[in-house]
């Protein structure tokens, strides 16, 4: 049943500043790797983009029914979804471009649709939330974006959280003044206060009766505030970013960045089996690893300022010169240790097997990024270099090898646009301007678009650039301190201060975040007792900081004695999709879709990225190869199950 709660008395007035007279058009050819030039053409004065009708929606659920509220700028309406047919009524309210806030609303609605209708034959398809279809409904999921085809209509449903990266209330508060300046009818002070209080009280929804008119009226009151806030922020984002906003933030960022670059990017690539095999194995993630674990009297923690944007600023224009079944050392690599070389003439990509006697190069194996004695895969030349050598003496090339040789035809093609964005962000940060966050989001979201859908002809996909950015990051951060305690993607925890010339507030320099005693019990799991600010991180567990501190101290004290303990940690898990639901429902029949579920997670220190042995500290060593790692992981998992977990309450008491 469709119910209209009320109509807005006054249509919200808004205006969008036109920051650019450029409209992108893409030339897409068949091919495997090429980033194609993006041509920009000015709009004629009498040309206008076709306006799109925009709406926003938000849901509330008790795990059985769904309250689905929608606002289109003039009217707020809602539907209560009790059976599959009601989903159609909800979709009828949506416009061709609609926004939701967070990774909750649409996935939960779709999963509940499957459960309500018992669409068992479609459940497998929607489990991964990538593709879902029934007779009259088709949904394709991308990251932060859904394409819905329903009843002859095409609806783009966009997760607005990606453009703000904080809670809805925080984002609305941050840009409250900006919304006023844009002419929006913003919430008054009393409404803001009530909205905040409502959000803090939202709990135990599974107890709510969606058949009670009074309950529905109360739900509608704050659901309406959510959807109006989402709607206003959706319209505001174009003006905030000052550039043409696309359906996702990474696409928005990379479209803008590429539009500022005059380059052909990568030239000379052709479809060839050996090339494809080499480049498919090239992409790896950041270095997230620990060489030592335990208690330390004094450590230094540093973060690289915007590490990936900085590495992106070093990307060159490349032209493939030759491929060969041989190995040739590049005597002038782009990076040696932490020193970049703007006079480098070539970039080599190798498909090789190498033997290393110390931890340098990382390879993907068994679903992890491992530094093993024998590494097989694809590598850049600079990954094999350090401050003094083009090929580290501890690295030997063994087995078959293949080399792709690229000529650098233009250096640092993204430098100007990256530095302009970064410097603008620094200036706004000094001014305490909330728009500072916008520039941070653009910088941090841009690099990943290069690596999307490797192996497909995506508009911005380029495996070489995506791989080079992360490889430069891994190589740089490890060479900051080859003997560091931990590497945390763009951070390093060391026993001694790093070189002073690497420290500063400029792009790519390292900022000292803390100094003091530390307990490190796993990757991203530590306490650092800096006199100015105690840092407590327990990656993978959403618990209060005070509880995390006690867990780390307890486990760390045992590790310091050479003993391993495990801890049972009660945690609340939000059931957002069918995959989670299926797993948890097997253990607990009371699990409800879209609701918090009380679960027990077990914390185990150490990890299987390295083989740890105890000698005052726990020291990590490399595995010989991926087979040895696979066998070790099986043995470790069997062993760790013999250690009975300790109840968290016994630690807290």
Swiss-Prot record:
Keywords for this entry?
DNA replication, DNA-binding, DNA-directed DNA polymerase, Nucleotidyltransferase, Transferase, Viral DNA replication
* Transmembrane segments annotated in the record for this chain: none
Tell me the superkingdom of the source: Viruses
| Swiss-Prot/TrEMBL GO biological process terms | DNA replication; viral DNA genome replication
What Pfam families does the record point to? DNA_pol_B_2 (PF03175)
Role according to the record: Replicates viral genomic DNA.
Give the protein family: Belongs to the DNA polymerase type-B family.
- Name listed for the protein in its UniProt record: DNA polymerase
